[in-house]
Amino acid sequence: MLIGKYFKKIKPDFRSHYFSGICFNSKLCEKNHIFFAIKGNEINGNNYIKHAISKGAKTIVYNKKFQGFKNGILYLSFNNVRKILAETSYKIFFPKIKNLIAVTGTNGKSSICNFYYQILNLNKKKVASLGTLGLKTVFGNLQMLNTT
């Protein structure tokens, strides 16, 4: 993943920097991860930056002044590291749905939804259907109450 896709307010020079995951516990850092050094009430994540780097972190998000590359590590400075972690996590793990089809009307909604589901599924698209008949995915069907 390229860091520029997830961090909009950084210098253009940093946008093509690669990362493979995120962590805020230095023990869980792996190669090419971003380490978020969060300052808490009792523990300061800045004290674990060296450990995160030794585990493979290539990017450090912290609240100190320096921003840039140092010894092959990219340091990004933000006032609220906890907020940046939340925003980045959301962008990585909950990307926006690219396409959403809604069917409204008096009659035939379930049939139309089923037709769309079949057409999209046959065309190798990621698809799910939620309606009166429940939740339908490639993994199976699930009966649901109160879908309308």
Task: Indicate residue ranges for each PLM-predicted region.
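Phosphate-binding loop of NTP-binding sites
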Residues: 4, 83-148
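N-terminal leader/targeting and accessory segments in enzymes
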Residues: 1-87
